[in-house]
Amino acid sequence: MSGHSKWATIKHAKGAADAKRGQLFTKFIKEISVAARMAGGDPQANPRLRTAILKARAANMPKDNIERAIKKGTGELSGSSYEELVYEGYAPGGVAVLVEVLTDNKNRAAANVRNLFSRNGGNLGSAGSVSYMFNRKGVIEYDSEQVDEEALMELALEAGAEDIQNAGGVLTVTTVPGTFETVLESLQAKGWESLSAGISMVPDTYLALDEETARKVLKMIDRLEEEEDVQAVYSNADIPSELVL
């Protein structure tokens, strides 16, 4: 499995899913709250909120948590106000890295992300330094042993998927952002449980790494994803399969 598989990176970085569930839910709460604050608490009229809720549900986040997050965003309940930031830079080996942040303290987030880059052999760059290497895509991933591959491919394409790939036992469905929700809802209706689902930054090309460099890159991604304010980390690293399984 290559490192550009989002699930592979998350699987390696997060370890046991149950141990990190609270941290994951915290990220969903921030995203849902921000989406509701920006465009209202009605998912049908707010595509970003609708997508955030779909992601939370895919991770089995309780309905009550979702509803509270929406109310915090709309102001019905008190809560922090979050700012969206994107940091760009390089990991060891020249790997391009994008870090998406939601924070209630911009200075804290900037200092922490910068320190994590420098302490792990990376370099934080300026805006635009690596983002041109990525495109925003909808990405949905499934364990190929848990779904009917032929049926999934047929349904996904009918619903508007752009591409479906099977690598290392993971089926990756790629969409343009505009069809992500339609495709995900169609697949969810079949009862298939995804490994991950969301709007991701997908690199145009991937950078192959030797084992030593790959370990350094994965360590850096680990540390970034563990940071409280970090919502997502994307890279163009192609990780050797033995390091992510």
Curated annotation (Swiss-Prot):
<comment type="similarity">
    <text>Belongs to the TACO1 family.</text>
</comment>
<dbReference type="InterPro" id="IPR049083">
    <property type="entry name" value="TACO1_YebC_N"/>
</dbReference>
<dbReference type="InterPro" id="IPR029072">
    <property type="entry name" value="YebC-like"/>
</dbReference>
<dbReference type="InterPro" id="IPR002876">
    <property type="entry name" value="Transcrip_reg_TACO1-like"/>
</dbReference>
<dbReference type="InterPro" id="IPR048300">
    <property type="entry name" value="TACO1_YebC-like_2nd/3rd_dom"/>
</dbReference>
<keyword id="KW-0963">Cytoplasm</keyword>
<dbReference type="Pfam" id="PF20772">
    <property type="entry name" value="TACO1_YebC_N"/>
</dbReference>
<dbReference type="GO" id="GO:0005829">
    <property type="term" value="C:cytosol"/>
</dbReference>
<dbReference type="GO" id="GO:0003677">
    <property type="term" value="F:DNA binding"/>
</dbReference>
<keyword id="KW-0238">DNA-binding</keyword>
<dbReference type="InterPro" id="IPR017856">
    <property type="entry name" value="Integrase-like_N"/>
</dbReference>
<dbReference type="InterPro" id="IPR026564">
    <property type="entry name" value="Transcrip_reg_TACO1-like_dom3"/>
</dbReference>
<keyword id="KW-0805">Transcription regulation</keyword>
<dbReference type="GO" id="GO:0006355">
    <property type="term" value="P:regulation of DNA-templated transcription"/>
</dbReference>
<dbReference type="Pfam" id="PF01709">
    <property type="entry name" value="Transcrip_reg"/>
</dbReference>
<protein>
    <recommendedName>
        <fullName>Probable transcriptional regulatory protein TP_0474</fullName>
    </recommendedName>
</protein>
<keyword id="KW-0804">Transcription</keyword>
